[in-house]
C-alpha cells in the first residue's frame, strides 16, 4: 500500500513538473536579434535558412516562417535589412522573403550595392542609389505598423544626436515613427563613410511634418542589437498581458537567439601599444570602427551570458558567432562572388562548431533545440487560443 501511495505521489510530481514546464514554455517571450555587418549578413542569412528549415520540418509546414515564431525581431544595419525581409508582408500577408531567399538576395544585389562608388576622396564611398532602389522595389509602401511581428530597428538622428528606434509598440505614442520600411532599412544601413545619411519626413500625431536625418543603427546602439531587442520585448509587457512574465526582466521566461556577422581575433595579434602610439587620425580611422564593433559585441554577449546564467537559464540564450574570420571575409563591402561564397561557407562551417569551449554542443544541435522550443511553444499557444 505504501509503495502504491509513493508511486502515485511520484506520478503527481512528474505531471506537475511537466505541466509547469509546458506552462512556462507557453508564457515565454521569443526574441531574435541580428547584428550589422554589410555583406557579412550572408552569415546570419545562412543560419536563418537552417533554422527556418528545421521549423518547417518539425511542423510539417513548408510555409512556416520565422515571423510566426518570434515575438520580437530586431536588427541593426544589415541586420535591420534581414529583419525587414522576414517581417514585411507581401500581398498574401506573409513575409515577402523566406529565409532561404536571403543569401540569393545578397548574391543578386550585393555587387551592385557595393559597386556604385562615388569616386571621391571626400564623401561616402558609395552613393547608395542602388541600395535605395532595391529597397523600394522589394518593400514597397509598407510601413512599420504592417510588420508581421514586433520589430526593433535602430538608427541615429545626427540632427538631434539621439537614437531612433522603430518599433510597432511605440506608434500609439509616437506615430511619426510609422515610417516606410525602405526608409528605415536604408537609414539603419547608412554607415558613415560608406553611404550618405538619409533624410525623410513623416507626420506627427497633430499632422505636422516630422524630419529624420539618419545614419547607421550601429552608431546609435552597437553592432549587436540584442539588448535593444530585449528592451523592446520588455516594454511590450506594459501593454500586452501575454508578456507579463518578463515585466521584471525574468530571463527564465525569455528565449533569445542572437546572430552575429562574424569577427576576427587578428586585431589582438597585429597591433601593439608601441606601434599604435605612432598612429595618426587616418590610421586609426581605418580600424577603429571594427575594433569598437568587436569590443561592444563581445561585451554584450558577456553581459547576456552572465545574466542568463545567474538566473539558471543559460540554455535560453544562444549567441551564434564566428570569431575567427580571416582575409576578405572580414570586409563589410567585399561583394565579389568569391568572397560571398566564402561567407556562405563560414556560415555552414559554423553550424558544425561547438558553441564554446565549455559547451561541446554544436551550433547545429543548439539551433535544433531552439527550433523544438519555438515549435512546441507555437503549438501550445495555438491550442490555448482554440479553446
From Swiss-Prot:
Active site per the UniProt annotation = 77, 216
Q: Which PROSITE patterns match?
A: PNPLA (PS51635)
One further remark on this entry is: Patatin have a dual role as a somatic storage protein and as an enzyme involved in host resistance.
- Protein name in the entry: Patatin group D-3
Natural source organism: Solanum tuberosum
Q: What's its job?
A: Probable lipolytic acyl hydrolase (LAH), an activity which is thought to be involved in the response of tubers to pathogens.
Q: Which residues form the PNPLA domain?
A: 32-230
GO cellular component terms given for this protein: vacuole
What the entry lists under Gene3D superfamilies is as follows: Cytosolic phospholipase A2 catalytic domain (3.40.1090.10)
Protein location: Vacuole
